[in-house]
């Protein structure tokens, strides 16, 4: 957190959160110094096999790794200012890259596959966050970029998209957001209802 006067807390909006974490546990400060003026560290992703946490230090264009007992170390630099991170059903890393305006997947051999970089022939704005559903579909948010004037956007809206598991079909699910940001599925059933948070905070939508 950038403001030491703020008290961190977890706001539980649904009982299903208890399936993931205990909200009664105290919040522990692990590290700081990330993000800079452009925003905080984001995109946390727990890598179960290695027992470590990956996260995006967007402003510094790098991916960091937190290992319990060892602290924070550099995982990758540069990252095209990647933000949201997740894994697909095969365990491959999927990332939203700001600078390259695309969503990518890292293969087992380290090569990069482009999941999406355009819609109907127009470049994406600035992919922000990404999740994978139990059927393998990839969902991501694509808000407009504050670094470009509206007339310079290829897409004249901020969107929420779904890509099929074979990377063959990209569908626009919503285009009426101002700035769609975080994305998650509510763990109530296998139907997987996607929820998107909007910034500035106008609420959560599904």
Briefly describe each language-model feature range.
Residues 2-15, 65-66, 70-74, 80-81, ...:
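Sequence signature of WD/YWTD-type beta-propeller architectures
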Residues 2-16, 21-62:
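Beta-strand-rich domains and repeat architectures in extracellular enzymes and scaffolds
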């Amino acid at each position: 957190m950038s403001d030491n006067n703020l008290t961190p807390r977890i706001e539980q909006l649904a009982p299903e959160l208890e399936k993931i974490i205990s909200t009664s546990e105290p919040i522990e400060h692990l590290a700081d110094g990330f993000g800079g003026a452009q925003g905080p560290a984001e995109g946390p992703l727990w890598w179960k096999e290695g027992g470590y946490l990956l996260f995006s230090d967007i402003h510094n264009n790098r991916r960091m790794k937190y290992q319990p007992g060892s602290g924070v170390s550099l995982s990758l630099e540069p990252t095209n200012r990647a933000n949201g991170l997740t894994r697909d059903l095969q365990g491959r890393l999927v990332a939203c890259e700001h600078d390259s305006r695309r969503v990518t997947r890292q293969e087992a051999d380290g090569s990069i596959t482009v999941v999406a970089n355009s819609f109907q022939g127009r470049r994406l704005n600035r992919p922000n966050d990404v999740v994978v559903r139990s059927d393998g579909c990839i969902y991501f948010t694509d808000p407009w970029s504050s670094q470009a004037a509206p007339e310079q956007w290829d897409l004249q809206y901020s969107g929420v998209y779904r890509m099929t598991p074979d990377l063959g079909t990209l569908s626009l699910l919503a285009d009426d957001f101002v700035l769609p940001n975080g994305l998650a599925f509510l763990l109530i059933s296998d139907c997987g209802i996607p929820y998107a948070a909007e910034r500035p905070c106008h609420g959560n939508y599904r």
